[in-house]
């Protein structure tokens, strides 16, 4: 079983992660593609970044500086799970994983990225902001989806072949999972859905759902899951499996609001 997560917009101010002696930070397997994208992004102005990603002027200026230094500042790279600091990563809590779970996560948890394509948790990355939905024109097309094409799906296929995984658990957002070309992907996909019930209404509450996606990835890693039916035992954040709302491809987890 593989699990995929979205990255985080918010980055840790002081990234830190204690690793066991036999587990070292790794290098992104699609680093050459990231370098190519960074060269394109390096030519963008702060106004360009504001327009493309709807971000503030200070954040746009910060990322202009980051892309300008991207190829010279490789020594500033840190493991992805240490750098990402959003709600999903609060649910994952990689800093508190034991050594065995972290080793398993390194092999079976994948992080989708607009800049790096596909990451392992311990892949060393540099601070950046480049969302997958960005309409950044490259020689491959008008968007990052065009740039990545089937490369992310093929990278997932390769990870599955290496690990023996037979199913992909999609804990990513629609924006990011769209980058995994389903026609090229050789794995069946299971997409857990996290709903909150309040006043008789059931709906996705973004904050809790993002945390639950990270917690689901942690649950998979800690228990080294391979059988999709074992996902039903997930209980973090007050969520519980709801069989009446679920299908095999879309298990639903419900919490009281």
UniProtKB/Swiss-Prot annotation:
Residue ranges the record marks as coiled coil: none
Gene Ontology BP terms: response to hydroperoxide
Any one GO cellular component localisation term in the record: cytosol
InterPro entries for the chain: YaaA (IPR005583)
Family in the record: Belongs to the UPF0246 family.
PANTHER family, sorted: PEROXIDE STRESS RESISTANCE PROTEIN YAAA (PTHR30283:SF4), PEROXIDE STRESS RESPONSE PROTEIN YAAA (PTHR30283)
The protein's name: UPF0246 protein Rsph17029_0026
């Amino acid at each position: 079983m593989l699990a995929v997560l979205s990255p985080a917009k918010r980055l840790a101010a002081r990234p830190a992660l204690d690793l066991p002696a036999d587990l070292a930070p790794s290098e992104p397997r699609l680093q050459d593609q990231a370098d190519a994208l960074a060269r394109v992004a390096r030519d963008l102005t702060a106004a360009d970044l504001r327009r493309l990603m709807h971000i503030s002027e200070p954040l746009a200026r910060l990322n202009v500086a980051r892309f300008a230094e991207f190829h010279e500042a490789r020594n500033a790279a840190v493991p992805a799970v240490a750098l990402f600091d959003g709600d999903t990563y609060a649910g994952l809590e990689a800093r508190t994983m034991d050594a065995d779970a972290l080793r398993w996560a390194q092999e079976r948890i994948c992080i989708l990225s607009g800049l790096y394509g596909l990451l392992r948790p311990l892949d060393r990355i540099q601070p950046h902001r480049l969302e997958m939905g960005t309409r950044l024109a490259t020689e491959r097309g008008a968007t990052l989806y065009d740039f990545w094409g089937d490369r992310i799906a093929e990278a997932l296929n390769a990870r599955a072949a290496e690990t023996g995984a037979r199913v992909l658990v999609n804990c990513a957002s629609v924006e990011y999972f769209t980058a995994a070309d389903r026609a090229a992907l050789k794995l069946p996909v299971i997409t857990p859905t996290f709903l909150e019930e309040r006043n008789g209404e059931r709906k996705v509450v973004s904050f809790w759902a993002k945390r639950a996606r990270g917690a689901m990835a942690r649950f998979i890693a800690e228990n080294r899951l391979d059988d999709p039916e074992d996902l039903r035992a997930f209980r973090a954040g007050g969520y519980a499996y709801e069989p009446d709302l679920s299908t095999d491809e879309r298990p639903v987890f419900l919490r009281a609001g």
